Design a protein with these regions (language model features):
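Short, glycine/charged-enriched secondary-structure capping and boundary segments
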Residues: 5-7, 86-87, 115-118, 188-190, ...
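C-terminal catalytic lobe of FAD-dependent flavoproteins
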Residues: 208-291
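Predominantly flavin-linked oxidoreductase catalytic cores and closely associated redox partners
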Residues: 49-135
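Active-site substrate-recognition segment that forms the wall
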Residues: 100, 107-245
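Surface-exposed helix-capping loop/turn segments at secondary-structure junctions
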Residues: 6-9, 13-18, 68-69, 98, ...
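Flavin (FAD/FMN) cofactor-binding and adjacent substrate-gating region
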Residues: 1-68, 72-73, 78-84
Length: 291
C-alpha cells in the first residue's frame, strides 16, 4: 500500500504530515477538492511542493556556466573512443573531444552505446487545463496531488500540480497519470513521431474526466494534451554506472527523478570525477543492465 509506505517514510524522516479522511478533515482543509468518502490522504506540509522543470533546468545550466561549463545546444549522434579519450560527434558534424563522457540523455541514452541498455520507454500523455485569472486565484492553495485510482478503466493513478504561469503567459493546471495498458516506444523514430503528435486522445480524455471529478465546477478556458516519454530501467532505479574507462551513464528516472535530479547528477558527477563509485548507497542498486 503506497499510502502506508509514504507514512512510514515520513515517520522515518520526521516529515510534517497528517493522515486525513476525505469525508472529514480533508474536505475542510481543501473545500474545492472532491474524493470518494472512503478515501484516505497523507497531507505533507513543510518543504512539500513541486518542481518547476523549466526553472530547474535554467538554474542548473546557469550554475554550470558559472562553474566554467560550456553549453553546446546540439544533439550527439555518436561516440567514438580511442587512446586519447572520447569524441562526441553532433548531428551537425561538430566533433567534441573529452577525456571522459557522462551520458544523461533520458530515453535516448542507450542508443549512444555499442551495447543497448535495458530501458523501457513509456509513451504517456499529460493534460493542460488553461485557467482564467479568477480560477487560478481560487485554487491558489491547491496542493500537489498523487491519487491512486482503484477502479478506473484507463488510469491506475494520476498526479497534478497547482496552477502555474507557462512561457506563453497563460496559467495552466497540469495533470498526468499512469496507464493500466502501457504503450511503449522502441526506436528513436517512434519517439520522434510520438513527440510530433498531441498524445493519446483516450488517455487525455480520461485525465480530463478525473480532473473535473476531483475539482467540481472547475472553470477551464481550454484543454490541450501533450506527449511525454517516461524512461524506466530493469530494476526501477536509475542507472548510474561506469560503462568503460571513459564512458559513464546516468539514465532512467522511472517517473520519479525530476525532484531528485540535483542529487542524482551529483552522484554521477562524483563517479566520473573519482573514476568509480563514491556514495553512501550500494553501487549495485544503480548498476546498468543490458538489453
Amino acid at each position: 500500500d503506497t499510502l502506508l509506505q509514504a507514512e512510514q517514510v515520513g515517520r522515518d524522516l520526521n516529515a510534517a504530515f497528517t493522515i486525513e479522511r476525505a469525508d472529514e478533515g480533508l474536505g475542510e482543509i481543501f473545500p474545492f477538492l472532491h474524493f470518494p468518502n472512503s478515501a484516505m490522504a497523507l497531507w505533507e506540509r513543510g518543504g512539500a511542493g513541486y518542481v518547476n522543470p523549466r526553472q530547474l533546468v535554467q538554474a542548473q545550466l546557469t550554475i554550470a556556466t558559472q562553474q566554467g561549463a560550456t553549453i553546446i545546444p546540439e544533439a550527439v549522434a555518436r561516440l567514438t573512443t580511442d587512446a586519447h579519450g572520447v569524441t562526441a560527434t553532433t548531428t551537425t558534424g561538430q566533433p567534441i573531444q573529452a577525456s571522459k563522457v557522462l551520458i544523461a540523455a533520458g530515453a535516448y541514452s542507450g542508443w549512444l552505446l555499442d551495447r543497448p541498455l535495458d530501458l523501457r520507454r513509456k509513451a504517456v500523455t499529460v493534460l493542460l487545463a488553461e485557467l482564467p485569472p479568477g480560477e487560478a486565484n481560487r485554487l491558489r492553495a491547491l496542493p500537489s496531488i498523487i491519487y491512486r485510482l482503484d477502479n478506473h478503466p484507463v488510469l491506475a493513478s494520476i498526479y497534478s500540480v497547482p496552477p502555474l504561469v507557462y512561457p506563453d503567459g497563460k496559467t495552466y493546471l497540469k495533470i498526468g497519470g499512469t496507464l493500466r495498458n502501457t504503450h511503449y516506444v522502441h526506436t528513436a523514430a517512434e519517439i520522434q513521431t510520438w513527440f510530433h503528435g498531441d498524445g493519446d486522445p483516450i488517455e487525455g480524455d480520461a485525465l480530463r474526466h478525473v480532473l473535473l471529478a476531483m475539482l467540481p465546477g472547475l472553470a477551464v478556458t481550454a484543454f490541450q494534451s501533450k506527449p511525454c516519454v517516461v524512461t524506466y530501467t530493469a530494476h526501477d532505479l536509475p542507472y548510474i554506472d561506469q560503462i568503460d574507462t571513459a564512458i559513464y551513464v546516468a539514465a532512467g528516472g522511472c517517473g520519479s527523478a525530476a525532484k531528485s535530479s540535483n542529487e542524482l547528477g551529483r552522484i554521477a558527477a562524483r563517479m566520473v570525477e573519482k573514476a568509480g563509485w563514491d556514495y553512501d548507497l550500494p553501487a549495485e542498486r544503480f548498476a546498468v543492465r543490458y538489453a
